[in-house]
Amino acid sequence: MAQAQEDSDPIGSILIQVHEDLHQLKEKLVKFSAEETRSTLDIQNLETAIQRTEMGLKIHIDKYLGVVNQEVLMAPVKKSLESPVTSKWSIPTVIDQKSFIFPMDSDFWRPQKHRGSLLHGLRRAKPKIQLTTKVMQDPENKHHRAAVTASYGISLPHINQRKAQDKVQRLIKGSTISNLTVLPPSHRTDPHFIPIPVLQKDASKGVLSMIERGLIPPTARITFQNPPIKPQALPLHSFDEHRKVPMEASFPLALKPRPVPEEVEEPSHQIEIPKGRAKRSRGPLRRKGMKIRTPSKTRKSPWDYIFSVYNGCVDRTAPDFLAFKSRFKLIWGSIFSFLEQIEKFLKDYAISEAKIKGKSLVSLLPEFELKNKLTRNDVLAVLENPVHIQMLLNLPGQRYKGQDGKAEAATKIQATWKSYKARSSFISYRQKKWASGVIALAWLLHCHRTRLKRIVKESRQRHLENFRIRAQHLAANWSRIRTSRRTIIHIPSLGYSQYVRKHIFDLDVEQNMQLGRLCDIIDANVNVIYICSHPMTDELKLYYRKLLSLQAAVKTGYYGDRTDLQNRFRIITPEAVNVFTKHHMCLATHLMYSPKAIKRIKNLIRGEEAYIVGGILHRDDLAVADMLNVPILGSEPELVHLYSAKSGSKRIFDNANVPMPPGIYDIYTYQQMIEQLSQLVTDNLGIRRWVFKMNTEFGGNGTAFCDIPSHLQCYNWVLKERNRFGHEDWKKKWAQESALVKISEELAGILAQHVQLVNEKRFPTWRKFLHMFLTQGGVIEAYPPADSVTNLTVDMLIEPDGEVRVLSMGDQLHADGPFISSGTTMPQTSVDPQVLNSLCLQIGNICKEKDVVGYFSIDLVTFIDPSTLEQQVWTTGLNLSYSDQLAMTQLTLYLTNGHLNCSLSTLEVPRFTEDSERERKRLSIQAELAPETSRYAVMSTQLKHDNLSLIFYYVFLQMCKAHGIGYDLEDRQGTVFILYESLKRYKLGMLTIGVDLQGVLMTFARNLFIIHQEISAPDMQGETNFKTTIDDIETILGVTEENKMIFVREKQSKEEEDNLYEPVEIHSEIV
C-alpha cells in the first residue's frame, strides 16, 4: 500500500520511511550491551518513547492515507495562463499538522552528528509547510513563481497583465464516504461476465445488502440446510428427435378405465408439446402410439386428475388418485387435510358419490391453508358435479341423514329452542327498554316543558306588572306628556291567536295598511317611529317623504312652501321579518326578536318622553315595551281579546244599555244553539235573516247567514198561532211551546242545507264552519229587516286620564258583500250626530269602567224599521284597536289642515293663511268665488287588482297624473294613494277628498274606472274588487239622489204649509 502511494504522494513515502527507521533504531537499541549504556532505566524510558512515537505515526499514517484516498482536492484554474502546469501531486491541507507526535530528546541521539539540527528543522518545518502550502495553492501570490522554481525547478513564464477573475470562495470537495460496490445490471443477467470479488467492507454490510447490490445472486445457497425444492436444469429434447408417447392403458380393460400412463411418476417427462411443434410429429403419433381412442385412454394434464369419493371415502387405489398423489407429494400434507375435511363434509350430508377435481383442489389449497376450514361453496368448487350435489344439500333434513345425524338434530332442536327463548326474552326486554326510553324521554320533555312554561309565565307576569306600573305613570303624567315634546312608536300589529293569524291571507300586508299613522307629526311636538312589516324601498320612502312634506304647503296653498320633515319620522323594519317568513308571527313578535331594531329605537327615544300605540295588543307587545322601557297607550292584552270578541262586546253593550239586534252569545254546544235559535225565531218572527259570527274571526271570515223563515214549512202556521194568541200572550212560554217543537225539528236540516258562508275559501262547508264556531264560541244575531241598511264605524279614544273622546265616524262601503267593509265615507251622514255621539259615549264610559284604555272602534248599523217607519240604530261590534279608518282620517286631516267636528258630523277646512301679496293675487282671481269650508272624504284600504303588480309605482303615478288623478293644494281636494309594499303590489289604498258627498263618490268611482281600464286587457282581467266597489258607489249615489228628492219634496211641502198659515199670522199681527 505504501508503494501504491509512493508514486503519487512523497509525504506518504517519507512518513513510512520514518516509521521504518524508528523500527530499526528500536532493534539496534535492544542489542546494545549494558556497558555501552549509562543505565538500564534510561534504556527503558527510551524504548517506551519510541513505542509511543511508532504507534502515533502508525495512526496518523492510516489517517493520512484515508484522507488522500477519499478526498479530491481542486486547485483554482486561471484562464489567463497560456500553458498551465499541474503537478502530479499536491500537499493536502486537510492534514492536521498538530496531530503529529514526535519523539522526545534522548541521550541515544547525541552520538549522531546532526541530531540538534534535525530537531530544530522539525520544529521549524510546521510553519514553513503551512506557508508553502498556502503559496502553492494561490497562483496569483507573488511568491508562487519563486516557490515552484525552488521546489520543482520549473520556471514559469512571465505574465505582465492578468485578467480579473472572481475569487473562489471555497474548495469544491467530494463525498467523504466511500461508495459501496454495486454490480452493474449487465453483469446480473449475462452469465459470461466474471463475478466481482466480494471485499471485506462489502461483506461487513450484511448478506441482505450484498443481495440487493447484486454481489450475491438471488438464487445462491447461503445456508447449510437443504431447500424443499432444488433448482435444476430441465432436459430439453431436440426438435428433430421423434419420441413415442405411450398411450396404451396399464391396466386390464375389464377394470374401470383410468387415464394414468406409467410415465406419470417422472415429472421431468410430463412436458406438453407446443402447438407449433406438435404439427411436425402428428403423423408418427397416429401411426405408432394411438391404438385405442377412448376418453379414458386420452393423456391428461397433471392438473386434470379426477378421482371419486364413495360414501364419504376417497378411492385411494384409483390410478388418478395415485397419480395425483405422486404429482403433488411435496405438498401432500395440506392436500391430505383438505381431503379429510371434504370426506367429513360428504359424510355429514350423506352424499353417496362425488368426484373431486384435482385442479380445483390445488387452486383452493392456498386459501385453505390460510383459513384452515372449508365452506360449502369451497367444497362445491372442487367437485365435478356441483349442481347435483347442491340439490342434495338443499333437501330438507339432509344433514341429519349423515354421520351423527341424531346428535346434530338434537343439537339443532336445542339450539332452536334456546334461540327462541332468548329471542322472546330479548324482544320482551327490547320492548320494555323502548317503553322505558319513551317514558323517560316523555318525562324529560314534560319536565323541560314545565320548566320553560314556568319561566315564560314568570316572564309574562313580570312584563304585565311592569306594564301596569308604567301605565300608572303615564296616567299620572298624561296632561304634561301630551303637550310636551314626545315620540310615538306605532306598532300596527295584529295580535290575534296563532290559529287566526295562520289563516289570514298575506298577513304582512294586512299589518301595513295604517301608514296614515305617520301623520301624527301634524303636531309640532310629536316625532313618529313607525314599525313596518315590509322592507321599505327607497322609492316608497321618497314617496312618503314628499307626501308628508306638504304640511306647510297645505296651510298656505302654495306648493313652494313645502318643508322636509324626514327627521321627524322614522320607518323601521325589524330584521326578523326576513328570517321568520313562514311562521305567521305578528309584528310585535318580529320586533321582539330583532335586537338591531330595538337598539335603534332605544337610541332614537333616548332622553325623550315616548309611548307605544299598538294594534291588537299581544303579550309580545308587553315584552317589547319592557325592552324599550316605555308605556303602552292601550289595555292589557287579555282585556283586549276578551272584549274584542263578539261575545265580549255583547256584554259591554248589555251593560251600556244600548240598542242591539236580537240575538244570543256565548254559544259553545250544538244543543244550546238549536234551542236558543228556535226561541229567537219564535220571538222575532219578523226577522227574515239570522247571522252567525265567530268570536275571534274578523273581516267577515267567521261569518255565515241563513234566511230561516223562508225555508220553514211551519212558518205560516206559526204566524197564525201568534195571531190567534195575540201579541201580549204570544210572549208567554206556554203559548210558544208547540211552535218551538216544530221549529226545532226543522232547524237542523235548514241550517245544513241553506246556510250561506261569507268566506267559502276559509270555510267551504257548513260542517267545518260549525265545528270551528262551537270551538271558538260565537253569537247569533238578527239582520236588520229592511232593504236599505247602512253600517257605520266610530273611532274613539279613552285617554290615560279617563277622558273619552270621539275621533272619527264614517259610513261603510261594502264592495265584497254586506258583511265585509271595504272603505268608508267620512264624516257620516246616516244618523243624527247627537244620537250617535250619545250611544258611543255610553259605550265608552262602560269600557272605561272595565279598565279599557286607548283606541277602540264601534260598529253600528242603521235602517228604517218597516213596522214603525222610524230609524233604528243597533250596535253590532267592538274592536279595541287602532282602526284603518282612523289612520285614513289622520291622513285626511293632514292634507286638508281641517278639523273633524264629530258632534256636528262635519269636516271643516280653515281659510288659507297668506301674506298680503299672495292674498291680492288670489282675490283678483277668485274675487267673486266664496271658498267652501267643508269637505267630504271617501277612503279605502282594501282596493286590490292583480294587474297592479305588472307595473311599477312610478309608472302607475305617472299614469294617474296623465289622467288628472291627483291632489290640488289650492282647493285642498283630490286623490292620494297609500302604497303598502313594492314586491307584490296587488293592493293599495286610496283617499279622495271633495266638497260634497255626491261629488266625492263620483270622483272616487271615476278614478277606479280609469285605473281599471288602463291596467286591464280584454283577455287579462285579473281578480279585482274595483267593479264591485263602483257598483256599490253607484247604489249609494242612487239612494242619495232619492233621499235628496225626498228631502226637496218634504221641504216644499213644509214651505206650503208655512204659506197657508202666514195670512193668519199677518192678520193676527194687524189685529
From Swiss-Prot:
Pfam family, one: ATP-grasp_IQCH
Domain (IQ): residue spans on this chain: 406-435
Basic residues composition-biased segments: 276-286
PROSITE patterns: IQ
CDD domains according to UniProt: IQCD (cd23767)
TM stretches of this protein: none
Tissue: Expressed in fetal and adult testis, in the spermatocytes and spermatids but not in somatic cells.
Signal peptide: none
Biological process annotations from GO: gene expression; lncRNA transcription; single fertilization
Biased composition (Basic and acidic residues): 266-275
UniProt-listed InterPro entries: ATP-grasp_IQCH, IQCH
Residue numbers spanned by region Disordered: 262-286
GO CC annotations on file: nuclear speck
Annotated function: May play a regulatory role in spermatogenesis.
Protein name per Swiss-Prot or TrEMBL: IQ domain-containing protein H
Gene: Iqch
